[in-house]
Amino acid sequence: MDIHKLTNDNYSLNNSHIHAHDFSLYAEDDLILNEHWKINAGLHFSFFNVQKQTYLSLQPRLSISFQATSNIILKSSFSQMSQCTQLLSTASLAMPSDLWVPVTRHIRPMKSFQYAVGVYYTGIKNWEFSIEGYYKDMYNVLEYKDGESFLGSSHNWEDKVEMGKGRSFGVEFMAQETKYF
């Protein structure tokens, strides 16, 4: 079990100060059903209070592994996540500039749902290979409106951003050599 204690965070944006309190708790367990099947289940609880607005979330995680042969493992997983600080990036300068911003009364936490499946192979001495595909749906993704950035006028930064949906997907390949000394 992992406990993240209550913290007081302060954010300064365009001469305004935002004070936030957060607390999180995470628990997980491995269940071995038999010599082939293994389940890892977890639950993350999050409390975030800012500007007299409280955001609570329960975020489940589940991973299932199947040992197909002595060298091949098949895995699938699901995770639901919520994030109360988001990274705003702008390319309006000659170099990228990033700004971390918290949720507020008007800006909701980003939420995502990720699914993954993969195959892992360990049949060659000191080597592990894997291929994994993933898909992620995201909600309340924050970005600057067209033509806006954190530079310039000092009016409310919340007026310069908009929320939307997003998705990402892909395939990851890995080859890893393990040496024991």
PLM features per residue range, with description:
Residues 36-39, 71-74, 125-129, 181:
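Repeated loop/turn-to-beta-strand initiation elements of outer-membrane beta-barrel proteins
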Residues 14-18, 24, 128-181:
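Outer membrane beta-barrel strand-and-loop segments of large Gram-negative receptors
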Residues 30-31, 45, 56, 66-67, ...:
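Residue-level signature of outer-membrane beta-barrel architecture
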Residues 1, 41-47, 76-80, 98, ...:
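Transmembrane beta-barrel strands of outer-membrane/channel proteins
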